[in-house]
Design a protein with these regions (language model features):
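Phosphate-end processing signature that detects enzymes handling 5′-triphosphorylated RNA
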Residues: 1-207
């Protein structure tokens, strides 16, 4: 399985600081523009206390059936490792209902991995968090502004319901800024660690 490997820093800032920081970034990055989108992430319950244990998520970008992803994420030696694969709406429903036998022999390594972990550790759908984000790919990494973070009421059954009730998790006068910087390794090291094919960074960090 191939992973995007990156360092991550995050901090809450005020609305005024957000406006100034965004303007400075746009001036520095030239013609690059921020992408605005909504992301809902459903976390599968497991050992939440240990960041070194991999966590799994179903992610829906802009409530689009064409942008549903299964995500695996864990931290090792202060470096985040992340893998993701596209999922159809039908397959997403099967995963949520625990109908995952089809993943056992899938060509997609992440599906096989999820099947194994879900079977061994009895993973089950947990809470859904919604993020309203702005993201920009910079010359040296990715900047994300989380303008709103809400916990969706009703659990996984409301993953695709746009009018679902929610509880605010971020103060209204605050913005959570996240910076991700890719770990740069020589191609030969990448190939030894992840196989002969280099990871498509754009795909791995699509949200």
């Amino acid at each position: 399985m191939q992973y995007a490997m990156y360092y991550e820093e995050q901090q809450q800032i005020s609305q005024d600081e957000y406006g100034k920081m965004k303007q400075q970034i746009l001036l520095r990055e030239g013609e690059r523009k921020f992408e605005s989108y909504t992301l809902r992430k459903l976390k599968f319950t497991g050992n939440d206390a240990d960041e070194t244990v991999a966590h799994y998520y179903l992610c829906v970008k802009d409530q689009s059936e064409q942008q549903i992803y299964l995500e695996k994420k864990y931290m090792q030696n202060h470096i985040w490792h992340r893998a993701c694969a596209k999922v159809t709406k039908k397959s997403c429903g099967q995963i949520l209902r625990g109908e995952i036998d089809w993943m056992k022999n899938s060509k997609e390594a992440l599906f096989r991995d999820f099947y194994l972990q879900a079977t061994l550790n009895h993973l089950s759908p947990g809470r859904v968090i919604e993020y309203q984000r702005e993201m920009l790919k910079c010359k040296d990494g990715y900047v994300m502004f989380n303008k709103k973070i809400n916990c969706i009421v009703g659990g996984w059954g409301n993953l695709f319901w746009p009018e679902a009730m929610s509880i605010h998790c971020l103060d209204e006068d605050k913005v959570l800024v996240v910076y991700k910087k890719k770990v740069n390794l020589p191609n030969t090291i990448w190939e030894m660690m992840q196989g002969n094919t280099l990871l498509n960074e754009e795909k791995a960090l699509v949200f």
